[in-house]
Amino acid sequence: MLNWVVTFLVIALIAGVLGFGGIAGASFEIAKIIFFIALILFVISAVVGFLRGRNRV
């Protein structure tokens, strides 16, 4: 349990340094792009899975 506390403390400290250091603006734009790419891939995967599921029945 203590290992998890130390791990999350380190992650929180790194996130705080990056957030207050000005890197957050650039990271936010990259995160938006990655989010939309993941969303598109999810929709494609769901549609293909739905269509393949229908053919097997």
Swiss-Prot record:
Any keyword Repressor? Answer: no
Top-level taxon of the source organism = Bacteria
Residue stretches spanning the membrane: 4-24, 30-50
Where found? Cell membrane
This protein's membrane topology, according to the annotation, is: Multi-pass membrane protein
What are the GO cellular component annotations? plasma membrane
Coiled coil regions in record: none
For this UniProt record, the keywords arranged alphabetically read as follows: Cell membrane, Membrane, Transmembrane, Transmembrane helix
Q: Which Pfam families match?
A: DUF1328 (PF07043)
Q: Which family does it belong to?
A: Belongs to the UPF0391 family.
Cross-referenced HAMAP family? UPF0391
Report the protein name in the record.
UPF0391 membrane protein Nwi_2359
UniProt lineage: Bacteria, Pseudomonadati, Pseudomonadota, Alphaproteobacteria, Hyphomicrobiales
